Design a protein with these regions (language model features):
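Catalytic-core regions of core metabolic enzymes
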Residues: 1-263
């Protein structure tokens, strides 16, 4: 529907079948699919106990971009998968993410492409639904998106905020970035400090979970306040100190980005 060139499916034991109105062949392994179709991207929709092995299989087959939608992948499994993909040079987005979309060009994942508008604002988020909300807020003020990606809300993910910010900074079609984080961990704080030292484009930030009680997981596996500077208030303060325009509410994202671009 969005123009993504789907050339193969992989399900062990079901090789030889045809799906999607008989247009797409199914293979028993990623290696076989890659050999037959030259596929260079893998999107993973397998149950949590098997997701990490699917990531490793794609990497071993030489696939350079892997998007894992699956939520609930065991942490120990992801430790192993992360080590392997880091050594192989595979770019993993996720797990527990909605994927990535370059507007009017290609979609990898489950994002509702119809809400997007082509433009020059990058969107980077741990949350799928907040990614969509940010896109909606941008469109409401007349701003389009270059690329939007959800990096995932699990403790161990393939592409970090800094990784994505580096790509947006180098992207000639991106003039500003919306950065959406949440409570728990240090990724947002590290990203904010990287922005201060390296980013030439305006960044608008939002942190979800301001009302979360300490010690209780809120939605994502990584969204838990353990004390120190991993609360929403602490992250918002650090973002502000690093020159990021911080939103108190997601409803401010569009207006804040419009003002940042005009400045």
């Amino acid at each position: 529907e969005y123009g993504t060139n789907v050339v193969a499916g992989v399900t062990p034991g079901k090789g030889g079948q045809m799906v999607l109105d008989g247009k797409v062949p199914v293979f028993n392994s990623v290696e076989e699919a890659r050999t037959e179709t030259n596929a260079n991207v893998s999107i993973i929709f397998v149950p949590p106990p098997f997701a990490a092995e699917a990531i490793i299989e794609a990497s071993d087959a030489g696939v350079k971009i892997v998007v894992c939608i699956t939520e609930g992948v065991p942490v120990h499994d992801m430790v192993k998968a992360k080590r392997i993909i880091d050594q192989s040079g595979t770019r993993l987005i996720g797990p527990n993410c909605p994927g990535i979309i370059t507007v009017d060009e290609c979609k990898l994942g489950i994002m509702p492409g119809f809400i997007c508008k082509k433009g020059n604002v990058g969107v980077l988020s741990k949350s799928g639904t907040l990614t969509y909300e940010a896109i909606g807020q941008l469109v409401n003020v007349g701003l389009g998106q270059s690329t939007a990606l959800g990096i995932g809300g699990d403790p161990i993910i393939g592409t970090t905020m800094i990784d994505a910010l580096k790509l947006f900074e180098a992207d000639s079609e991106t003039n500003g970035v919306v950065l959406i984080g949440e409570i728990g961990g240090q990724m947002e704080n590290e990203a904010a400090r990287w922005v201060k030292e390296n980013m030439t484009k305006p960044v608008v930030g939002f942190i979800a979970g301001r009302t979360a009680p300490p010690g209780r997981r809120m939605g994502h596996a990584g969204a838990i306040v353990s004390g120190g500077d991993d609360t929403a208030e602490a992250k918002m303060r650090i973002m502000t100190e690093c020159g990021i325009a911080v939103c108190e509410s997601v409803a401010e994202i569009g207006d804040k980005m419009k003002a940042a671009l005009n400045n």
